[in-house]
Amino acid sequence: MQIQTIRQYLPHRYPFLLVDRVTEVTDNSIVGYKNVSINEEFLQGHFPEYPIMPGVLIVEALAQVSGVLGFIMNNETPKPGSLFLFAGAERVRFKKQVVAGDQLVLKSELVMQKRGIYKYNCTASVDGIVAATAEIMISHQKTEQA
């Protein structure tokens, strides 16, 4: 799935769209990636002499790829008034720094679904080495545009 299609699933735009491509989708899992460039705005201040991707943005990238999966799993096309929103994160662990030039591989697998809340086991890795893990929860919400 290329960026044009990802933009149909996610409301995020520059500089906050953190999924560049989706490479694999199954009934309950998704794999995508974020190419981390030295030109990222967040790297200008985190940290100027040693730029690393903030951990919270790694978690956000995992939530975004999980949101894409939420639409796909429900066989739903995104439309105004319907979003999968980041509802929470548990058991977040950061294991490796992510730096400019890295390709951050984002994996998300559904582990629970109940009343519009979805829980995913997520892993972010670089070159096959785990950079972060988290349990991500998203919620299917109707917005005021509905």
Curated annotation (Swiss-Prot):
Q: Could you state one GO biological process linked to this protein?
A: lipid A biosynthetic process
Q: Does the keyword Lipid biosynthesis apply?
A: yes
Fetch the SUPFAM superfamilies from UniProt.
Answer: Thioesterase/thiol ester dehydrase-isomerase
Where does the secretion signal sit in this chain?
A: none
Q: Give the catalytic activity.
A: a (3R)-hydroxyacyl-[ACP] = a (2E)-enoyl-[ACP] + H2O
Q: What is this enzyme's EC?
A: 4.2.1.59
As for what it does, the entry says: Involved in unsaturated fatty acids biosynthesis. Catalyzes the dehydration of short chain beta-hydroxyacyl-ACPs and long chain saturated and unsaturated beta-hydroxyacyl-ACPs.
Q: Where is the active site?
A: H46
Keywords for this entry?
Answer: Cytoplasm, Lipid A biosynthesis, Lipid biosynthesis, Lipid metabolism, Lyase
> Where in or outside the cell is it found?
Cytoplasm
Superkingdom of this entry's organism? Answer: Bacteria
GO cellular component annotations, sorted alphabetically?
Answer: cytoplasm; membrane
Going by the record, the broad EC class of this enzyme is lyase
**Pfam families from the UniProt entry:** FabA (PF07977)
UniProt-recorded name of the protein: 3-hydroxyacyl-[acyl-carrier-protein] dehydratase FabZ
